[in-house]
Amino acid sequence: MQRVKTKQIFVGNVAVGGDAPISVQSMTFSKTCDIEATKAQLDRLYFAGADMVRVAVSDPKDADALKDLKKVSPLPLIADIHFRYKFALIAAESVDCIRINPGNIGSKDRIKAVADACNARGIPIRIGVNGGSLEKQFEEKYGATPKGMVESALYNIKLLEDFGFSNIKISLKASDVLRTMEAYRMLRPLVDYPFHLGVTEAGTLPHSMIKSAMALGGLLMEGIGDTMRISITGELEEEIKVARLILQYSGRQKSGVSIVSCPTCGRIEANLVKMVQEVESRIKHIKIPLQVSVMGCAVNALGEAKHADIAIAFGNKDGLIIKEGKILCKLKEDQLLERFITEVEELAKQREEV
């Protein structure tokens, strides 16, 4: 399905919305005022492939540290503000975007002050609606439902627009798949602002992967979404890896290696799990789109190879390498993997030069 066209904004030098690629972001977990620790996490996310990063602003020390942190950050910075609107006013002097939670930021006057500060610097505001912290009037009327989340978003969008502010992106996050998807679907036809996708508090890696693949992958395939964060109780790099995979398999990102590998069965002669893990590890740096097939026997290998750019099929102490649908060579198992990696890298290089 064609992607929904939205208004384009900029977070630092990263375009969000319009025809810009769907960007990936994460959030540091260090105390933001600890410049050294936070810079180390920013660097990790940069090398993992993040496009922008959010940092928590929980106290005055965090707010005051943003100016120095911005100087050393390799990525655009988003300040995450809850409760204390004055921290947003300080943050607006340094960062590339402000996230506010309508459920706890406070009165209209406070929101206007934040809007004025962001307008002065030309930076966007994310209206970050969370199903677990809706404003009292929406919680009492609708409960923590998609309708309540959408009404909160619409109310705060109108507030900002009334204050002369339209440099906006929106998120509608719940901790479960169905509420998240329904909220985004309900709001999408009503506004043209870019959407930040996410499932909040999604859990550890396996739980978050499944929730995020279902919710975000589903929305992306419907054409909804302009930037995204995968929320994982775990390592920073995993958030970026999972996000990129969801973008790839939803058809919204045409880059990187897509690996097809068979499940294990009684026909397999080689240690397929180990082989697939090694292939993944050694070709993960490749950015050119490639379809790579790793098969444990000949039953489906030739059929899969027709759809792959390059394939390997393990047999009884030997195997085949099949490149662009043709058998390239048959080698002993101890020679097979190294030759395959070489051929994959060579094919990627050839495609890159075209």
Swiss-Prot record:
It catalyses: (2E)-4-hydroxy-3-methylbut-2-enyl diphosphate + oxidized [flavodoxin] + H2O + 2 H(+) = 2-C-methyl-D-erythritol 2,4-cyclic diphosphate + reduced [flavodoxin]. It is an enzyme of class 1 (oxidoreductase). GO terms for biological process: isopentenyl diphosphate biosynthetic process, methylerythritol 4-phosphate pathway; terpenoid biosynthetic process. Its EC number is 1.17.7.3. GO terms for molecular function: 4 iron, 4 sulfur cluster binding; 4-hydroxy-3-methylbut-2-en-1-yl diphosphate synthase activity (ferredoxin); 4-hydroxy-3-methylbut-2-enyl-diphosphate synthase activity (flavodoxin); iron ion binding. The keyword Iron-sulfur applies. Its cofactor is [4Fe-4S] cluster. Belongs to the IspG family. Converts 2C-methyl-D-erythritol 2,4-cyclodiphosphate (ME-2,4cPP) into 1-hydroxy-2-methyl-2-(E)-butenyl 4-diphosphate. This is 4-hydroxy-3-methylbut-2-en-1-yl diphosphate synthase (flavodoxin).
